[in-house]
A protein has these predicted regions:
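Carbohydrate-binding surface patches
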Residues: 1-4, 9-11, 47-89, 118
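C-terminal beta-strand-rich structural cap/linker in extracellular carbohydrate-active enzymes
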Residues: 107-133
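Short beta-strands within extracellular/lumenal beta-sheet-rich domains
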Residues: 164-187
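A short beta-strand element within beta-rich, extracytoplasmic domains
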Residues: 188-203
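Short, surface-exposed beta-strand/strand-loop-strand elements in extracellular ectodomains
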Residues: 206-215
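Extracellular carbohydrate recognition and processing domains
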Residues: 215-239
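Short beta-strand-plus-loop segments that form exposed binding edges in beta-rich domains
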Residues: 245-252
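Conserved small/polar residues in nucleotide/adenosyl-binding loops
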Residues: 265-272
Length: 274
């Protein structure tokens, strides 16, 4: 409830609540996380086997401090290895376990932790540097035509997919102008030219319309034989937040797994190092 900024409701008999559960409910650091001024919900950035890693900004958007949950809903212990780059954190990272209310010291590169079955580890992490995001999952997108009540015929849906990065994809995208997927917080530190790579799947030729801040690119004849494939296009991002929209006004678009956006400056730096 705290990592998702959910309402705080106690659904048990307070006369018989176990001491551990009562202590958890009274944990001031978890309550502070739940009541964080930003009021954001965490999103999944890593999903391997049955484990999940969720992250969100706290205190300040695009700041150096983030909340991270290592969630293990399975029946077996889970060994987490989470690169700090995945969490958009750079340099030395100060880690605090909020459930145990214990500092774990400074770490660099990654965090490694074992989480017991049906358990979660919630951390507050403070980094030396905030990294620019690279990957944007399909399940983070806003879907204006999404319908969870089952009242629409062939509605746009999130579909489990083991070959996708987050184990989910968007299906039944397009068919009409208003049935799109939109990411409104595609962030660029300085703005400029970027290489956008879109990961998709479909079983026949499909068209995808990609709009970046209103500038549209049309990709025709995409066909992956139901495998996850990628297509790369050049895009221009402004400094700060950008809006990316995908769909197809007059036919079905391919299913979308995710997309990445990497600046040409970053690509050239890697090529120079190589």
């Amino acid at each position: 409830w705290c990592i998702m900024s959910s309402p705080l409701l106690i659904g048990c008999d307070m006369n018989t609540i176990p001491d551990f559960s009562l202590k958890l409910l009274k944990n001031k650091e978890l309550i502070a996380l739940n009541q964080d001024v930003l009021g954001l919900q965490a999103h999944v950035v890593q999903h391997e086997n049955e484990s999940y890693v969720l992250v969100k900004d706290i205190e300040q958007k695009r700041g150096l401090t983030r909340a991270v949950a290592l969630y293990n809903p399975s029946d077996q212990p889970c060994d987490f290895i989470v690169p700090f780059e995945t969490l958009e954190l750079g340099g030395n990272v100060k880690v605090r376990d909020l459930i145990k209310q214990k500092d774990l010291g400074k770490m660099k590169g990654e965090i490694r932790q074992t989480v017991q079955p049906h358990s979660v580890m919630i951390c507050k992490m403070e980094a030396e540097k905030r990294l620019e995001p690279v990957s944007y999952e399909a399940e983070w997108a806003y879907l204006p035509c999404y319908d969870d009540l089952g009242k629409k015929s062939k509605p746009i849906v999130y579909v489990p997919a083991s070959d996708c990065s987050g184990r989910m994809k968007i299906s039944r995208l397009g068919g009409r102008e208003e049935n799109f997927a939109e990411w409104s917080e595609v962030y660029s530190e300085k703005g400029g030219n970027y290489e956008m790579t879109i990961f998709y799947s479909c079983d026949k030729n499909r068209k995808l319309e990609v709009s970046v801040n209103g500038t549209k690119t049309v990709l025709k004849d995409l066909n992956s034989n139901n495998e996850v494939k990628s297509v790369t296009i050049p895009v221009s991002l402004k400094q700060g937040y950008n809006t990316v929209r995908m769909g197809n006004d007059f036919g079905w678009a391919p299913d979308i797994d995710r997309f990445t956006a990497v600046s040409y400056t970053h690509l050239r730096a890697h090529e120079t190092c190589a």
